[in-house]
Amino acid sequence: MKQYDAKKILNIAFAGHSGCGKTSVAESILYLAKASDRLGKIADGNTTLDFDSEEIKRQASIMTAVAPIEWKGTKINIIDTPGLFDFAGGVAEGMRAADTALIVVSGKDGVNVGTEKAVEAANAAGLTKMFFVNGLCDEDARFYRVFETLKSTFGPSVCPVVVPYIVDGKANVYVNLFDFKAYEYGPNGAVKPTALPDMGARLEGLREAIKEAVAETSEELLDKFLMGEEFTPEEIVLGVSQGVKDGSICPVFCGDAHNTFAIDQFLNSLTWLAPSAAAKGEEIGVDLDGEPVEVSVNANAAAAAIVFKTVADPFIGRLSYVKVVSGKISPDVPVINMRTGAPERISKVLTMTGKKQSDTDYIGAGDIGAIPKLVATKTGDTLCSPLRKVVLDGINYPVSSYSMAIYPAKKGDEDKVAQAVGKLADEDPTIKFVSNHETHEMVISGLGEQHLDVVISRLKSKYNIDAKLQKPKIAYRETIRKKVSAQGRYKKQSGGHGQFGDVWIEFEPFETDSLEFAERVVGGAVPKNFFPAVEKGLRDAIKKGVLAGYPTVGIKATLYDGSYHPVDSSEMSFKTAASLAYKNGIPNAMPTLLEPIGSLKATVPDSNMGDVMGEVNKRRGRVMGMSPAGHGVQVVEAEVPMAEMADFATFIRQITQGRGSFEFSFVRYEDCPANVAQKVIEAAKAEAEE
């Protein structure tokens, strides 16, 4: 593929609810533009964009894919994003690389939660928005019902461009409201002009909707509209184009991807409606001092690019997908990674069509491509010229709120699992992985059950590692509520030097996260040189509480008496004596189990606020407050025991149909209710006996 100036490059992110047909629309475009020699079908597992084995198996996109086409002198970079909520990280990546968002809507199912979330993501990224109502060959499709829902949901900016003429449930004639011409589609994508169908007042009403939208783009056109004067075709084209670019108009196209009906009309309009990479304007980055810097889409400027996606595959190697904002990226252009501060050597650059790689001389300003073998570079990094160091905006990923413990099927493979999950997290930064040294578990977090299920599948398919998920353990604590004194006496005689240590220690509650050690020994009952050994013995002992084996916190231990033997006493004997004092005394100090409490901030629609508050109470939580967040959304703040939050991500998604989200973080420890504590203690004892 030849190189294009940024003025002739369009970067389009395809988004929408799962199953709306966005990948099918993209495949239809690739086929029409001869970028693919077949019309890929998801059901057949032969699409260009859903090429991953997991995508083929699940018949759904789970990661962002890229494919460029050439259409009437314009390069269009298609960025296909996932529709499943569990893979929303891919949407964030796609929106970061795009200048326009095409939101695909099912003609049968209409506007869904995924439609709303796609619009929200596009708005957050500041992108131009367009709609495509797909699947109109389905007899259950209802274009005009869907169109009215789009207008009522997203406002008067929604403007029809191409509409179907439906007879007996069949939509093979489409009217372009710009040129007021009709086109008839037949088998194998055949298309021919046809007479305007008799659609009664509907057609004129749709045409009037365009005029109203155009009138809003300038005072001059508004005056003309109010005076009842007709717009010229040129004024309509310019008005709509301006309105689309400034966001006051969201054009609606339609068709059927499986039959390639009206796809050409969308492409023809796209070339003059969508803002080019150059037209989007400059990005604002920051320099080394944190000061804002304008980075313009200029082919002759210093290089600056954002890495918006990473592939780390054991078979094809590592690929970093980049959107070049300024300058160009090529093997002869030196760049540095602004996160690491180190230079990155570029051996070659690629154009990606799904998984197919094609060498290219360079990736120019406004364009998208990939760089192989950048080992230290991660998604979200900025690559730029050392002559002009700048950090571009990264990627705002959704919070990974669903956590599970991960165990290898084969004992001893823990390191293999950790390394493999780390590589998967390089590809998908919404995968979080930590080793909890307290519970001795590896914990993996993601966006939902299906997300982590894919992780398990990929561990097997990519790295031949079998692993399983289970509910993570909770890091409880133990403390005391009563002051006691206890003796620890250790004596061992077995020929030669023996072992002797004797201590009296006072234990009492104290405001500390671990152990406060003190001494008030008089008369040398315990020599000072053994004090550190006593403290060490206690610090080792508190790692395992007397109730359920959890660490003991909030305790002060004061060494106040004891005895020693001038020959047999040693650091080891006093260390052991201290641990015996702990074991003898703590059971009498009213030991108490503590549970971790977290702060919950749930953002949900107004209609779900009562459900969420009720669920918080059911989970032993306390609602701390509520506040409106605008647009019919409320933020519920609460404190909830961490033990009750394992499946909260699933609950909030189900109750809000995917509209809700939440953040949850540890706050403090509190006394565990007696009935809950008893279950925890019994479970700990049962595990210890296994």
Stretches found by the model and what they are:
Residues 1-690:
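Structural and coupling elements of P-loop NTPases
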